[in-house]
């Protein structure tokens, strides 16, 4: 019994201490009475706030720091900007390159990522005043167009020159064997029947007849050189009725330049063209004779005529656009137009 009494006494002392500790302090009661008298109560928050609170800073969100706010602002600005579309990488596709029987060969081909909108963006960045409506017409193109218009106006004022078209090439069937056909590329000749008629008309000229009769060794006028004369007539671009004696000798002289290495035989063309023959001019290499010949007015006239012939030869060469070479196939085609013509009998192989 004594033990239980002592336990109750101790418990009563402890409860008394607790009640005294819970009783409000008189100073605290006064502060509470003042706060309730006329001012609103303030709520006390036990959460810790990092850093000193400056005036003007809202301490309401305690967990949001200044760095977090800046990151949020930057993220908002980045969201407001339009997202840039990345250009797609060029793709590759497989296309059919060759089909042989039942087998098909594929070839890998690169697909270009350039789109029409890229051309529009490029034209929009041009200088002000440039019309971007045609995407392929740039400022440089306009300048070229102006220069071209000026050149066309100047060409209209000058007489137009008719140039001979360049020869084309076609594919013709050479051989047919069973189900296989062999193709051969063949050159289309520009020689027309009117060119043959102009050549035959010039053969009736007395000076040309005399020249062909004099060349018995065929060193200047064999069948291939004469066929080149017809080819040059077709390339010069003149009408058939305009070809005269001078054109025949110009073409023959140019053909000798292209095919022959000996320069002496073709010099006889000058003497037949200007009314002289080679036999009438003595081959004397005496200096006194050469000096007297230089002082002769007739010799001066001959030199001026030869210089004029060389000038005309160069003009005739330019009228053909420099195409003085003639293939063997084209010469055979020219001769095949009239194979019974007496000119084609002038063959050097028969003389030997």
Curated annotation (Swiss-Prot):
Residues 1-90 are annotated as: Disordered. GO terms for molecular function: protein kinase binding. InterPro entries: Speedy (IPR020984). Residues 76-90 have a biased composition (Acidic residues). Residues 1-12 have a biased composition (Basic residues). Residues 16-39 have a biased composition (Polar residues). PANTHER family: WBSCR19-LIKE PROTEIN. Belongs to the Speedy/Ringo family. This is Speedy protein E18.
């Amino acid at each position: 019994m004594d033990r239980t009494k002592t336990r109750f006494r101790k418990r009563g002392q402890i409860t008394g201490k607790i009640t005294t500790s819970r009783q409000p302090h008189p100073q605290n009661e006064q502060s509470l009475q003042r706060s309730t008298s006329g001012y609103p109560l303030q709520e006390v928050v036990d959460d810790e706030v990092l850093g000193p609170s400056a005036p003007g800073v809202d301490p309401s969100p305690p967990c949001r720091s200044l760095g977090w706010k800046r990151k949020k602002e930057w993220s908002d600005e980045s969201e407001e900007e339009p997202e840039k579309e990345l250009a797609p990488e060029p793709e590759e596709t497989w296309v059919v390159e060759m089909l042989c029987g039942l087998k098909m060969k594929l070839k890998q081909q690169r697909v270009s990522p350039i789109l029409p909108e890229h051309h529009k963006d490029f034209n929009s960045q041009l200088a002000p005043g440039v019309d971007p409506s045609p995407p392929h017409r740039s400022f440089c193109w306009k300048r070229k167009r102006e220069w071209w218009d000026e050149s066309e106006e100047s060409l209209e004022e000058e007489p137009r020159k008719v140039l001979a078209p360049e020869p084309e090439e076609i594919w013709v069937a050479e051989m047919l064997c069973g189900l296989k056909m062999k193709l051969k590329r063949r050159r289309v000749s520009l020689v027309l029947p009117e060119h043959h008629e102009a050549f035959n008309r010039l053969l009736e000229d007395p000076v040309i007849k005399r020249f062909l009769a004099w060349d018995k060794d065929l060193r200047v006028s064999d069948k291939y050189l004469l066929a080149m004369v017809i080819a040059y007539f077709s390339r010069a671009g003149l009408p058939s009725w305009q070809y005269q004696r001078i054109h025949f000798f110009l073409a023959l002289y140019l053909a000798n330049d292209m095919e022959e290495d000996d320069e002496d035989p073709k010099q006889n063309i000058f003497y037949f063209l200007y009314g002289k023959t080679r036999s009438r001019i003595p081959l004397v290499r005496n200096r006194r004779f050469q000096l007297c010949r230089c002082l002769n007015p007739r010799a001066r006239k001959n030199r001026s005529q030869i210089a004029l012939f060389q000038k005309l030869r160069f003009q005739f060469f330019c009228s053909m656009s420099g195409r003085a070479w003639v293939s063997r196939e084209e010469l055979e085609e020219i001769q095949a137009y009239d194979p019974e013509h007496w000119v084609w009998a002038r063959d050097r192989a028969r003389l030997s």
